[in-house]
């Protein structure tokens, strides 16, 4: 019996503790359907642009399977493994920002290279992310009475990116170029269809660069309430430490003068503007969340 216990623990990769109420000691298995909501501003970020601000919401919806491998006098140890889908929505705001780059010869009508300048104002960008997460944790629990118990969680959570899209953009971009063949005179003419002012609403979007894999340590405390003989409800607070680099580092500073444009999406008339997500050096999910679950024990 002990060998089976150790094999199951190794298989689950468990490093967690979860205290659960139980209706009777014969219940060895549990199915837990849960929803988890991020608390506060769920994404914090570092950026090369000091005026860039962000706010976000996160959530998680999943199903866990638990196996009680030890119980005695109201105490229980339980191994858990599950799967969940975790969507996130991040809104980025920027009042104004300027940058420039050396455009290649192919960008010009007569095959000459030139310097292009951008002035961005009132830029708003919304990014939608999705991840599949695999929580693996242990359970220690104390049954206070027939309908109420306390629990504490300790484990790990693995995350895998499923999608990342720029779902909304608004703001304005004004661009112009300096051409060496015209003795560095400022050129701003309507026939250059990628110059002038462009409204960025309904632009054609690129894909934000996001880390495809993440890992965090899962810690939680909460209470379980009995609803019927086998059905219970659980409310807990969880702390997921270690989910970092949701966005990868792209550049080492604010100097974007180079041979190719630092571009992620463009609008229909050819005006190009860099995605705000590329200016994030790093970001991370807020570690604190509220979890509500329905539990069926058998």
Regions found by a protein language model. Give the residues of each.
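Residues on the lipid-exposed face of transmembrane beta-strands in outer-membrane beta-barrel proteins
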Residues: 33-37, 61-69, 83-85, 134-140, ...
């Amino acid at each position: 019996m002990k060998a089976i216990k150790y094999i199951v623990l190794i298989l689950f990769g468990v490093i967690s503790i979860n205290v659960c109420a139980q209706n009777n000691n014969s219940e060895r298995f549990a199915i837990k359907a849960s929803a988890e909501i991020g608390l506060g501003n769920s994404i914090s970020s570092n950026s090369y642009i000091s005026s860039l601000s962000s706010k976000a919401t996160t959530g998680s919806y999943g199903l866990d399977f638990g196996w009680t491998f030890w119980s005695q006098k109201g105490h229980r140890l339980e191994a858990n493994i599950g799967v969940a889908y975790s969507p996130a929505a991040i809104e980025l705001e920027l009042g104004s920002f300027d940058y420039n780059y050396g455009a290649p010869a192919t960008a010009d009508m007569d095959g000459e290279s030139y310097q292009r300048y951008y002035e961005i104002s009132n830029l708003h960008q919304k990014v939608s992310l999705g991840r599949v997460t695999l929580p693996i944790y242990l359970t220690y629990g104390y049954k206070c009475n027939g309908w109420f118990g306390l629990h504490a969680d300790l484990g790990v959570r693995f995350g895998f990116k499923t999608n990342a899209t720029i779902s909304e953009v608004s703001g304005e971009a004004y661009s112009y170029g300096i051409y060496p063949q015209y003795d560095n005179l400022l050129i701003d003419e309507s026939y250059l269809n990628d110059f002038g002012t462009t409204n960025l609403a309904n632009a054609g979007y690129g894909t934000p660069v996001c880390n495809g894999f993440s890992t965090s340590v899962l810690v939680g405390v909460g209470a379980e309430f009995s609803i019927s003989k086998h059905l219970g409800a659980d409310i807990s607070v969880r702390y997921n430490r270690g989910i970092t680099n949701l966005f990868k580092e792209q550049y080492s500073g604010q100097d974007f003068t180079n041979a190719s444009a630092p571009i992620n999406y463009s609008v229909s008339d050819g005006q190009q503007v860099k995605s705000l997500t590329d200016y994030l050096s790093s970001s991370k999910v807020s570690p604190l969340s509220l979890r509500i679950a329905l539990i069926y024990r058998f």
